[in-house]
Amino acid sequence: MSSGIGSLVKVIFKNFDVIAGPVISLVYPLYASVRAIESRSHGDDKQWLTYWALYSLIKLFELTFFRLLEWIPLYPYAKLALTSWLVLPGMNGAAYLYEHYVRSFLLSPHTVNVWYVPAKKDDDLGATAGKFTPVNDSGAPQEKIVSSVDTSAKYVGHSAFDDAYIY
């Protein structure tokens, strides 16, 4: 019987991130968020709103770089440690991370440095169009003749789904 319990403990320790990850990152925050909604104080609301914003950023990062992250052997444990720091009530990791990094990034004006500006070419649209303008025998550009539009034709809006549509 002891070998069965030993095997179970071994499996639990090997897969600790798989077992504890959803509990720490989803179950407890959902429970605490519902309690925060039902309470009258707004301090805990801010903690859990910032947690869910950071959780969505973490998930977006994971979905974007999942091929790279699967090659990092300690990533699940690092994510579990980070999530634990964000969630645990005494640490207020979500509020700290939001106030010091995310908020300052979102509120600061962003500038874009353009390191390469291509030189303007002589072949702009006007010059290119001039190359293909018809020329008469004297060498002068020929006036373009616009044909008159037949306005007597009536548009009958048929679609392929109408019974009167002719194939």
Curated annotation (Swiss-Prot):
The keyword Membrane applies. The chain crosses the membrane at residues 18-38, 47-67, 68-88. It is a multi-pass membrane protein. It comes from the Eukaryota. Induction: By abscisic acid (ABA) and salt stresses. Keywords: Membrane, Stress response, Transmembrane, Transmembrane helix. InterPro entries: TB2_DP1_HVA22. One of its GO terms (cellular component) is membrane. The keyword Protease does not apply. Predominantly expressed in flower buds. Its main location: membrane. GO terms for biological process: hyperosmotic salinity response; response to abscisic acid. It is found in: Membrane. Belongs to the DP1 family. This is HVA22-like protein b. The gene is HVA22B.
